[in-house]
Amino acid sequence: MDPRIDQLAKNLVQYSCNVQPGEKVQIQSVGESPKPLVRALVREIYAAGGHPFVELKDPVLTREIVMQGDETLYKLWEEVDLYKMRQMDAYIGISGADNVNEMADVPSAKMRLYMEKYLSNLTNERVNNTKWVVLRYPNSSMAQLASTSLEQFEAFYFDVCNLDYGKMSKAMDALVERLEKTREVRIVGQGTDLSFSIGEIPVIKCAGENNIPDGEVFTAPVKDSVNGVISYNCPAVYNGFTYENIVLRFENGKIVEATANDTEKINQVFDTDEGARYVGEFAIGVNPYILKPMKDTLFDEKIMGSFHFTPGRAYEDASNGNASAIHWDLVCIQTPEYGGGEMYFDGELVRKDGRFVVEDLEVLNPENLK
């Protein structure tokens, strides 16, 4: 067994989920490649005194089900899986699909039905009522997305996933404190001039508890406060389709105009429901090892010098009241290589070209987190 896999399993069980004796842990694995990690997790959960429950999923079969699925199917499927989820104390989700585009040709109406009638409530139950963590597993598909060899990608992956998240967590405290005092945020960059309020919405740090890799601090904008335009410079894969050159224009919180490489298709996403045209999350990425996009949200949203501004559902622990079947983390990178940019808290410049420029936040610059 690769010792890096053993270390990752230990981090997931002991740090991310903090599994205690007697606790029930669901391991949900997608694809063939994560099996070595699943095996290590089972051993680690037993060592912690917990009870592992393993569920293996195949994206090809999921696509086949969704292509034909109806409300009757999803109602019972949701009922069964909600029952199982409600018995769990913790959840570890691992994605290792061989083809990230497996769902690309599923009609949008069928995907919407699947998400609304099955996936949405199940996700809410997992997020709000279990100790959970989700991650990808390094395979050839991910290496292709990152334009590297598998060996090189594995080295990058384990550096990112096994870094000292305890150190990162302490460093994030200063940013949490800053954001808690902030009322107005303005972000400026190439094709971007965006402003919004945070108000009294809570600020949450993410340092390896729920996502691996991790490295973000998030809150949410006051729902109707967002105005201006944002040009995202990071490709975004949604239901198997890669969107690029996404530009959103906001008026009083609502997306009133959306364009992309497929403008019709992206507007279908934002027409999923009323909440899909409002933003449920604003987050700042700080992972020092992730420097460029690889078309994988779990990595891209943590890019050092980035932020993401997320149409759709807000998280309960930092809620602005927005509800939706979607939660789509769209990323904008502000490092010099991607055009630079500035971030202001209550009129004060706090980050320029991806680097924090105020003394209390410099601890989050990459050289201080490695």
Residue ranges and their predicted role:
Residues 295-369:
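Internal helix-turn-beta structural module
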Residues 227, 243-245, 252, 277-281, ...:
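Active-site lining segments that contact anionic ligands and/or coordinate catalytic metals
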Residues 32, 97-99, 139, 201, ...:
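Short, glycine-/Ser/Thr-/acidic-enriched flexible segments
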Residues 224-268:
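Long, well-ordered mid-to-C-terminal structural blocks that present hydrophobic/aromatic surfaces
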